[in-house]
């Protein structure tokens, strides 16, 4: 009996201990905790390292935070944020460090690789600063989930990743410069037979697509991978496939199956924009009854919407932009579940009445079509609309009040139409972008726009907006682009417009009626790239605080009344490419320091129509390093780049080829120097000949003297040369005939002498290029150069014809000559008969008489 009690007691104790042990969390092994702490200490915490995080599957934004900050020795690593342990053994089996703000090098011998029992590892959305992906990732033999996406890894994806045969999810997508050799791509698909999700977006694979995909695949993301060849039809018959992304592979040919796909019932998202769609959209598309998202932009589709697409009545996101589709927009009422519709850059026409039927819309982009008429004013059901883009159509009338009343509006773009009327007050408090430029809107800027907390883009240029710029604009502390140019604004520029906004990149207040001084203080650390204030009535000096604009690429203060000397300190803005101070009251000599880096990046320098004096700024001209290179690129023209040129094109007055014009975009190869209409004197520096990339040179209307430098022959891409209205002397260098790109030449009103060079380009210039130079000779002038054939003028030709065609004068001369000859002849005959003169003289006389008679007969025949 005692034995039974003893056994029972021991069993009871064991069960209690077992229950107690199962209820307590296991402490992770000390060596694994140490490995994690060592891993933590390899990186710093930087919020910018995870500044943009989102769920790759749903694209929903995720808030980043430093998970590793909570890691310390005083607690079990199983309780640390992002660390998950096996409930039985306490081993670390999962590590979730996505969006953890980690920054630093990821070393190949990282202590992380000591966690050999890991099954899930997520390091996405950090910044590992161009680290290589270590082959040791292939040693995690138990891994089922591996996510290294968007963490700034670079280089080749190691073949050892192909050893992870248990993987269900593999995400290695990044635009930092990852690549996967074609053989390893094929090996990966062959070995990872358990894959459910494969995401290699933006990895450079440069291969055809093998057909040996895992039959378990639900998600295949291969967008932007440089794939080519023909997509295997087997991909469409993967029975579990839910999401297929192949976008931005222009060398990839996609030929959809003509029969029903095995994935028809499961496929929910299909992204094939910017690929080569072969043939027409087949009827088999009609069976994609579960399809919610279809992206087929830039696929060279043309004509009406393919009929099979009209059967996709469950579609929620539809993108058919950048094609050649046409037809009335009203047909889209059939898609009642649509939340996002993009038909941008097609040929759709008609009105917007269909908006009354699509009440679920959240995002609508119909920009760059042929839509006409006003926007209907009786629409009331679009309370969920967040983004509305109708730019570059033929819409007119006033902007209806329901647009201003949208409670959730975030982005609005109605630019490049002919809308009129006033801009009403906005109800939405969540606006981030308002673009109404290039319309006929009038009135004042509504206060509701100036009180937005998240507004980043405000583009209202090229309208008839009037009034003062309210100081309330300084409340827009998140503003990046402010474009109010080409309106009727007046008054002064609010001092705080730049001072309070640390994010402002583009400031354009050009072509208004603004007055006063530029009294804004440009603070240290600002990120301004464009300042355009030209075409106003601004006075005073160029603010010295502009030297703090270290990122400035364009400064245009032209056509104002600024009264200052040359702001030489602007040369320390090493990003500056375009500097225009034209048509002001700037004066005095242009002085420069010995710093050879000043203005080295300038591509356009326009100081014309001022009062500058003294010699030409030889040292500054010698510093223009960018102009000392010739752009030999071929293909499409490249423009001076700007990260926001999708929204904004600066308007700058360019003087070239003898004309002024407003340039919206400036070619990267456009190198211009315009110092005309000043009081510069002295010689033209020969150092200008080193600026071999120069396209336009205008030094006209100064007091320059001396000779044209022979070094100008080096300006091999020069298209326009204007040296007119100076005191330049000497000859035109014959070497200039080698300038084969020269289209415009003006050397008029100087003191040039000698022969005009001959050549393909010089032979095309008229008198106006040389007038006012009395000492010049040669084509096209009437004065000849030595050794040239006589150039017969039209007047001389007329005179010759007149003399040749006068029968009276010619006939009288012949008669007089014949009469004299007859008298002399008779006398000679008499002497010959009387004196028996030699016979040879008689024969000569007869021959002479025959010649005269023959000429008379010919003259009679002519008339």
From Swiss-Prot:
TM regions (residue ranges): 813-833
Keywords, sorted A to Z: Cell membrane, Glycoprotein, Leucine-rich repeat, Membrane, Plant defense, Repeat, Signal, Transmembrane, Transmembrane helix
Induction per the UniProt record: Induced by C.fulvum AVR9 elicitor protein in a temperature-sensitive manner. Repressed by sly-miR6022.
Record's keyword annotation contains Repeat: yes
Extracellular topological segments: 22-812
Membrane topology: Single-pass type I membrane protein
Region N-cap: start-end pairs: 24-91
Site (Not glycosylated): 674
Designated name of the protein: Receptor-like protein Cf-9
């Amino acid at each position: 009996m005692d034995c039974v009690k003893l056994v029972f007691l021991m069993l009871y104790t064991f069960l209690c201990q077992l229950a107690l042990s199962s209820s307590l969390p296991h402490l992770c092994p000390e060596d694994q905790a140490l490995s994690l702490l060592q891993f933590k200490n390899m990186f710093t915490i930087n919020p910018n390292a995870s500044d943009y995080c989102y769920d790759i599957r749903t694209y929903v934004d995720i808030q980043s935070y430093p998970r590793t900050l909570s890691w310390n020795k005083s607690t079990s690593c199983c309780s640390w944020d992002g660390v998950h342990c096996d409930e039985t053994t306490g081993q670390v089996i999962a590590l979730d460090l996505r969006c953890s703000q980690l920054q630093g090098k990821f070393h190949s011998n990282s202590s992380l690789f000591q966690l050999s029992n890991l099954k899930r590892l997520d390091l996405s959305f950090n910044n590992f600063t161009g680290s290589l992906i270590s082959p040791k990732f292939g040693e995690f033999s138990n891994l089922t989930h591996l996510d290294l996406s968007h963490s700034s890894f670079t280089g080749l994806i190691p073949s050892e990743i192909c050893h992870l045969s248990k993987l269900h999810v593999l995400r290695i997508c990044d635009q930092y410069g990852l690549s996967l050799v074609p053989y390893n791509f094929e090996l990966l698909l062959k070995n990872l037979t358990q894959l459910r999700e494969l995401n290699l977006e933006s990895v450079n694979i440069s291969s055809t697509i093998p057909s040996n995909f895992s039959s378990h695949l639900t998600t295949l993301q291969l967008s932007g991978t440089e794939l080519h060849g023909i997509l295997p039809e087997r991909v469409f018959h993967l029975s579990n496939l839910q999401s297929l992304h192949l976008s931005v592979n222009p060398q990839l040919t996609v030929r959809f199956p003509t029969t029903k796909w095995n994935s028809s019932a499961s496929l929910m998202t299909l992204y094939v924009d910017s690929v080569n769609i072969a043939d027409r959209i087949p009827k088999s598309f009609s069976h994609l009854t579960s399809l919610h998202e279809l992206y087929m932009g830039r696929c060279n589709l043309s004509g009406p919407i393919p009929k099979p697409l009209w059967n996709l009545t469950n579609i929620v996101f539809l993108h058919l932009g950048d094609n050649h589709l046409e037809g009335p927009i009203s047909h889209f009422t059939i898609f009642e579940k649509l939340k996002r519709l993009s038909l941008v850059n097609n040929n759709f026409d008609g009105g917007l009445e269909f908006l009354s039927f699509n009440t679920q819309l959240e995002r609508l982009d119909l920009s760059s079509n042929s839509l006409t008429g006003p926007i209907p004013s009786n629409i009331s059901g679009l309370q969920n609309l967040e983004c509305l883009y109708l730019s570059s159509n033929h819409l007119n009338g006033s902007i209806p009040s329901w647009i201003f009343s949208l409670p959730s509006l975030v982005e609005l773009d109605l630019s490049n139409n002919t809308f009129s009327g006033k801009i009403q007050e906005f109800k939405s408090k969540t606006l981030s972008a308002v673009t109404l430029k290039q319309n006929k809107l009038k009135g004042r800027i509504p206060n509701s726009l100036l009180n937005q907390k998240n507004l980043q883009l405000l583009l209202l240029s090229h309208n008839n907006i009037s009034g003062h710029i309210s100081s309330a604009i300084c409340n827009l502390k998140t503003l990046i682009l402010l474009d109010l140019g080409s309106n009727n604004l007046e008054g002064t520029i609010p001092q705080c417009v730049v001072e309070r906004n640390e994010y402002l990149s583009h400031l354009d207040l050009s072509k208004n009626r603004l007055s006063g001084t530029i009294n804004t203080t440009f603070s240290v650390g600002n990120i301004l790239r464009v300042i355009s204030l030209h075409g106003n009535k601004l006075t005073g000096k160029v603010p010295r605080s502009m030297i703090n604009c270290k990122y400035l690429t364009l400064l245009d203060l032209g056509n104002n009344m600024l009264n200052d000397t040359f702001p030489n300190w602007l040369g320390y803005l090493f990003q500056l490419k375009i500097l225009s101070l034209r048509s002001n009251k700037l004066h005095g000599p242009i002085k420069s320091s010995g710093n050879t880096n000043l203005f080295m990046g300038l591509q356009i320098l326009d100081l014309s129509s001022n009062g500058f004096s003294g010699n030409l700024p030889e040292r500054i001209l010698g510093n223009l390093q960018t102009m000392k290179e010739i752009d030999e690129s071929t293909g499409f023209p490249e423009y001076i780049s700007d990260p926001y040129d999708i929204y904004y094109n600066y308007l700058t007055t360019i003087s070239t080829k003898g004309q002024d014009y407003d340039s919206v975009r400036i070619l990267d190869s456009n190198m211009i120097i315009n110092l005309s209409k000043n009081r510069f004197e002295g010689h033209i520096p020969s150092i200008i000949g080193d600026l071999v990339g120069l396209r336009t040179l205008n030094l006209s209307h100064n007091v320059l003297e001396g000779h044209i430098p022979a070094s100008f022959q080096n300006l091999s891409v020069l298209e326009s040369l204007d040296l007119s209205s100076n005191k330049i002397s000497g000859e035109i260098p014959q070497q200039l005939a080698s300038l084969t790109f020269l289209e415009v030449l003006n050397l008029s009103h100087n003191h040039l002498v000698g022969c005009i060079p001959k050549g393909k380009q010089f032979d095309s210039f008229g008198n106006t290029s040389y007038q006012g130079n009395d000492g010049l000779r040669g084509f096209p002038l009437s004065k000849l150069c030595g050794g040239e054939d006589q150039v017969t003028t039209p007047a001389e030709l007329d005179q010759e014809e007149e003399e040749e065609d006068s029968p009276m004068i010619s006939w009288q001369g012949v008669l007089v000559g014949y009469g004299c000859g007859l008298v002399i002849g008779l006398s000679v005959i008499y002497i010959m008969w009387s004196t028996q003169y030699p016979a040879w003289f008689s024969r000569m006389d007869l021959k002479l008489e025959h010649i005269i008679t023959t000429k008379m007969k010919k003259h009679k025949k002519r008339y």
